[in-house]
Amino acid sequence: MVLDNIRNFSIIAHIDHGKSTLADRLLEYTGALTEREMQNQVLDKMDLERERGITIKAQAVRLNYQANDGRQYILNLIDTPGHVDFTYEVSRSLSACEGALLVVDASQGVEAQTLANVYLALENDLDVFPVLNKIDLPAAEPERVKQEIEDIIGLDAHDAVLASAKEGIGTREILEEIVNKIPPPRGDAAKPLKALLFDSWYDQYQGVIVLVRILDGSVKKGDKIQLMSNRRNYEVLKVGVFSPAMCEVASLSAGEVGFIIGGIKDVQDAKVGDTITNLHNPCDAPLSGFKEVQPMVFSGLYPIDTSQYEQLRDALAKLKLNDSSFSYEPETSLALGFGFRCGFLGLLHMEIIQERLEREFNLDLITTAPTVVYKVHRLDGSIITIESANQLPPTQEIEFVEEPFILASIHVPNEFVGGILALCEEKRGVQREIKYLTPTRVMIVYELPLNEVVLDFYDRLKSITKGYASLDYEHLDYRRSNLERLNIMINGEVVDALSLIIHKEKAYYRGRDLVSKMKELIPRQMFEIAIQAAIGNKVIARETVKALRKDVLAKCYGGDITRKRKLLEKQKEGKKRMKNVGNVELPQEAFLAILKVEG
């Protein structure tokens, strides 16, 4: 294949700006799919991707296109995940391309997520050109949005393609732009094999399928390959391309994008960003930029019905096959029984995994409040990392605790600025800058503790701005903070599942809210129940659930007071004994409500 006739490109867009629909039109136009095979969002294979309108895994599709200059081109569309949690995957997918289409909704303009991914594309030296989508909408303002693209991103947008993926307007113009504006790949097929692995997933019949962009050299069936990060060796069983169905080809050479199947059993071995080379004729150095993705948010998942524990374990193992950035380990809780502590890249990642467990595997789950990774500096000089309140050592052993901070950039219409600033201040944020991108849109940049963001920040951000805010964040560093463990006690017993790590200033208010919420939810028993919030040995808030009382004097009718007193004393004794041995059953709602108490 002549390198000059290949174009590798991806599509950058904010959620819901029409990326997957545009990809469908390109597939349809180039004849990759017949009318009969067309379905909406062909590349989003998971139901969940279609429903939420987001792309979770990367896909790569080869399109054959006869251009206006009469030449036949191969266009490789590499579809990238578009959400903030998957930034590393996006950057790897982008580095497999030479150019990108920036798709912007002509009625909404530039959003935070678009901005983050455009900067990633420019860092990877991609040629980016804008496409205004949804121009068929009555609210479309192409001229205003062109100006926004020039002002905010600094891209020349005067000749941006006007398109409507839904109506099929502008599809040929976009394909011509791809051919004319995106440079062909560079590479040398005679050099030793060097390929970038930019996605992998597990297929139950063929093992792990890896998506690669060949930079130098070539690969064919029967070759011995090596993954350079872990020095694992495999024999190539199949090479091929997606168009969009899997098609086997004789070989893949420099500049091309396709898949390799090599009998790899575990997705853990095929990490995104790794370099693949030939075992007997290796390239001199791996590609730069590879890193192990670390989970940032942790949460406990427990089956509501304990008999589903085995099913949950199998389901997690299956999800792990396709998602190497997700981690889990068994944990037990006195209150919730057996479950798993799971690690996620971020909030959206967590929601997606939970939703897939419930939907694809029919599991009913309780999720404990999400936590982040803290660094605890002990007095003996050692540093430990913890991801749940129950792992925090006693106060007398701790010198100080550090928590992770993020840099959040929030794009909002200017009428909501006051509410957003108040929210960020309440979440212990440090203001970096406020920038008016246009007379009506503002970018607010804050440094925020991740611990404050994981609970309900995103929901409140959306409700303050009526859904118009968009948020993007990147991890900054760890900072020393005044953090403590808040325990909830019921009749003097600590309920481990409800413990949390919280900032000292907020501990009293949070404790008070929690105990009053629990008071409403715990059913009354025959004895009174004390609900307390405590830091260390100091109780900071208390509520009491009053006892139910049986009228033991009903049968007495008048008569001697000593008889009544005897019965009352007996009742009192019984209640006392009951309180000592009685167990308080915490209803499921109590746990769920605790997660919903405003942080």
Swiss-Prot record:
Its membrane topology: Peripheral membrane protein
GO biological process: positive regulation of translation
Listed SUPFAM superfamilies: EF-G C-terminal domain-like, P-loop containing nucleoside triphosphate hydrolases
Keyword field: Cell inner membrane, Cell membrane, GTP-binding, Hydrolase, Membrane, Nucleotide-binding, Protein biosynthesis
PROSITE patterns, alphabetized: G_TR_1, G_TR_2
Major place of residence: membrane
Catalytic activity entry: GTP + H2O = GDP + phosphate + H(+)
Matching NCBIfam families: lepA (TIGR01393), small_GTP (TIGR00231)
Name of this protein: Elongation factor 4
Species, as recorded: Geotalea daltonii (strain DSM 22248 / JCM 15807 / FRC-32)
Gene it is expressed from: lepA
